[in-house]
């Protein structure tokens, strides 16, 4: 039977999007969200959180289905939640954000940073990384969670419009005071992470990405394609027991070593942050903090992860805005 690889890759991506990704998180509870909008230049996080904790900020309920900010403006959200009394055993509990992510490049998009009430950073949020930890899989709570399971998180949301490259735009001078893009608030949920389901999604992501970059004259190309097809045929979202079978179908091709003459590559995390590109310079300063906070979150998960940031100015901005991660890690 002729295997049409490009068609199967497209099919696999659809399976990932529609039949795997929706099952990665199991929603346990919803949060209460209040917001205050600043259409102009942002306030330093430490100053804002100090005012918020002391009751000097009037947060208003955030409407579902409505834009939550204005172009180049900042919206602060106060997220209140309560962990359920009984949590799924052996599963990480996370706060999952849907701030209205749209299908375009991450750099020109809404972004956010989550803080504890003491002003320390938890991690950043963007369309491809929209969660933060509450309880680890082995039951260790983040210090944002109180002994009774309640928590308050302060989220600095940047309402950045999508500025197209190399074209004339009206969005490049200053905040406009209006929502030029409709990023509609959807939800902030307490959810249990299914690590096996996420790992299956990651396996399929690696396989599809490899097939898109391999030469079809390589025998391994066809072995990967056939294993991918077999795997997604086995996965039935209505029968969780098929997950193990679907992953097993990928085992052999995922663990085969490269040929003897292949180069050995060592991968390293590196942030390419444009200092002055499609956003204000002050937004670059905030992007540096968000990027580093997520790199640190990865280091907490995997001590072998190595991260590089090459611009000295970015380190200076980081120390100015977020001295805590610079000094303690």
Indicate where each model-derived feature is located.
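Carbohydrate-active enzymes and regulators
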Residues: 1-329
